[in-house]
């Protein structure tokens, strides 16, 4: 919430009046592109909604704050989890799903978010495999076969939405989590 608010506050004049602050006062945003770009602001809001660590500098700030406090051994208190409401909920949900014997697919739009989810799954001792757009050929097939082979005991499969739905059969999964749906309804409908 704090970081979302900071993005808004940084661009408040633009949102309210179509103006931006300059060193010499306030000037109207011109068509030439002065002022914040809406697409960039949207992307910053999307990142913030996924996890504050996706914003530049936030992870270092949160980790420094945590180092000052007495670090708890409880995973729910780890800054990677506690700084994101989605991660707090995901920890509770995945713990319950694992205890009940479910197998889970987790989709994300961003490979950087998959990186954070991968760190989270390791921290929580959840077994997983992953594919994204950078994983090709045999490595991709091996990850799919490993997940589908129940004897391997892989609980989660991380997938990027772009790499994930094409030519993949993951019949052993019974739960799908879309960590961050696309803000474009046409893309999300696919």
Question: Language-model segments: which ranges?
Answer:
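Conserved RecA-like helicase motor core of SF1/SF2 enzymes
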Residues: 126, 134-137, 161-190
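Conserved Helicase C-terminal RecA-like lobe
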Residues: 1, 6-12, 20-156, 160-164
